């Protein structure tokens, strides 16, 4: 009987759950991404850390990632900000999280001297969030459907 009860406990892992915890993670993730983009612009770090250096220190093995021109870097920061806002409110979530991940990771990979360990976490978490149903609760997408 005890083994049957353990099996029953395992089947609850696959039962539908509530989406509020995923919504909280999505909102916090989007807010952190938006704040990181706003901080880059507000402190002038876009120009001093990403645009101005004549030589960019690259990550070993990732030298093939192109460094965009000045307008391209500013555009990437804008994409990070707008897509982070989209992730936060759950508006066109899949498009927002993919564009956030792409732009954020690109900015991270073009300059190794701007390394922050939580940025690597944002990259890994963003990659996972592409495949999770994070916009099923407390989002514009959920209200639309």
Which residues make up each language-model segment?
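Alpha-helical membrane-anchoring segments
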Residues: 1-145
């Amino acid at each position: 009987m005890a083994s049957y009860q353990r099996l029953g406990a395992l089947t609850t892992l696959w039962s539908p759950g509530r989406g509020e915890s995923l919504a909280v993670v999505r909102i916090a993730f989007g807010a952190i991404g938006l704040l990181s983009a706003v901080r880059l612009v507000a402190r002038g770090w876009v120009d001093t850390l990403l645009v101005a250096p004549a030589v960019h220190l690259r990550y070993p093995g990732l030298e093939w990632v192109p460094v965009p021109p000045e307008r391209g870097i500013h555009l990437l920061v804008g994409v990070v900000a707008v897509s982070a806002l989209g992730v936060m409110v759950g508006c066109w979530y899949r498009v927002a999280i993919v564009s956030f991940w792409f732009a954020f990771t690109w900015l991270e990979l073009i300059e190794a001297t701007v390394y922050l360990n939580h940025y690597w976490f944002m990259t890994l978490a963003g990659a996972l969030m592409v495949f999770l149903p994070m916009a099923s609760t407390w989002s514009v997408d959920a209200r639309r459907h």
